[in-house]
Regions:
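Conserved beta-strand elements of beta-rich interaction domains across eukaryotes
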Residues: 63, 96, 154-155, 162-163, ...
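N-terminal anchoring/stem segment of glycosyltransferases
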Residues: 1-128, 132-144, 227
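Catalytic core and acceptor-binding pocket of nucleotide-sugar-dependent glycosyltransferases
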Residues: 202-322
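GT-A fold catalytic core of metal-dependent nucleotide-sugar glycosyltransferases
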Residues: 130-186
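A short acidic (Asp/Glu
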Residues: 100-103, 157-162, 233-234, 256-257
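PAPS-dependent sulfotransferase catalytic domain
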Residues: 172-221, 252
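Short His-Asn-centered micro-motif
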Residues: 58-61, 91-95, 150-152, 173-175, ...
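A short acidic, often aromatic-flanked loop/helix-cap motif at beta-alpha or helix-coil junctions
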Residues: 118-125, 179-180, 274-280, 314
Length: 323
């Protein structure tokens, strides 16, 4: 039995996996059919299904890229709202946002929470979401069971990610695909992380981390019980250096630095190294084309529950509905 200490609610681990078979998503002019969650592909769903007490936290600061990103964001919110209709969606905003952004949030029943004025100067939105998310969760802790920390336009939900997580869990997504080469300055895909670490924590620290065979965490997705998430965000907030809060990449570098240093052990942070539950930019096995297409994880017959990036662009160009 898993206890939610904030609400007194108990969660019982399911003796058998929840009943899932295949997921069909009908897209205008395109069908995504037969996503496989049968038998062993359904074993990942061990916990209660998502309810309105489960929250996905997003953040947004307006940029000139809004018109370009609007289509992607519409697709992502269409998907999450169809897959998780009961979940509470919360958007933490920084500064003024355009009217069509507000309309999009209203369309998908997303609660908008404006940030205090103190975050309008000296803060990048991705860094500000650490203290903003912490404050929101502390204020509403008694109303929340589980919480997902999610990027806004390129995290794709194909099934109930909350049913894979217990109240005492805290799981973060790894960005590296290969567990043997996750933080190498000579590896093109990870070079940015190396130089971020150099910039924020020094050359010696960056080179030291190239010797570790541990994953590079991605700042775009994590999920867990609300108490665990509050513990993590409290630690991140305490360790933030004010002179870097305006710089892109600092939030993720801070997360990785604390993880490598072993300072998140007490928080109980686990890392998902690209499994069926979640994966960053996984290369999918795509079967079919035209009006009938399905996909699974590379090297598996099982469909992913959640992807961060990695979804074929031709699917994102369509309007999504369920059948």
């Amino acid at each position: 039995m898993v206890m939610n200490h904030s609400s007194g609610k108990s969660y019982t681990l399911n003796a058998l996996p929840l009943s899932y078979s295949h997921q069909n998503i009908t897209i205008t002019g395109f069908n995504l059919t037969g996503l496989n969650y049968e038998r062993e592909c359904g074993d990942i769903f061990k916990y209660p299904k998502a309810t309105e007490r489960d929250v996905i936290l997003f953040s947004y600061g307006h940029t000139r890229k809004w018109k370009h990103n609007k289509k992607d964001m519409r697709f992502a919110f269409s998907l999450v709202r169809k897959v998780l209709p009961k979940v509470t969606l919360v958007m933490l905003t920084m500064g003024d946002v355009p009217q069509d952004f507000i309309q999009l949030m209203t369309e998908f029943n997303v609660t908008m929470v404006p940030s205090p004025k103190q975050y309008l100067k000296g803060w990048n939105c991705v860094n500000a979401r650490i203290p903003l998310s912490l404050e929101y969760l502390k204020q509403h802790q008694s109303d929340i069971d589980r919480v997902a920390w999610s990027d806004t336009r390129d995290v794709f939900y194909f099934n109930d990610i909350f049913a894979t997580i217990g109240m005492n869990d805290l799981v973060w997504m790894s960005e590296c695909v290969s567990p043997t080469d996750c933080f190498r300055h000579s590896t093109t895909g990870q070079k940015l992380h190396f130089y971020w670490m150099w910039w924020f924590y020094g050359r010696d620290e960056a080179f030291k981390l190239t010797q570790y065979n541990t994953p590079t965490l991605n700042g775009g997705f994590g999920i867990g019980g609300v108490s665990r998430m509050i513990q993590l965000l409290t630690k991140l907030n305490q360790e933030m250096d004010p002179k870097f809060t305006f710089q892109w990449g600092y939030d993720q570098t801070l997360l990785n630095y604390l993880y490598y240093k072993g300072e998140l052990i007490d928080v109980g942070l686990d890392v998902d190294r690209c499994t069926q539950r979640m994966c960053f930019a996984n290369k999918l096995n795509i079967v079919g084309n035209g009006k009938s297409t399905t996909f699974s994880m590379k090297g598996s017959s099982c469909a992913p529950v959640l992807l961060h990036k990695g979804l074929p662009s031709r699917l994102m160009e369509m309007t999504i509905t369920y059948r």
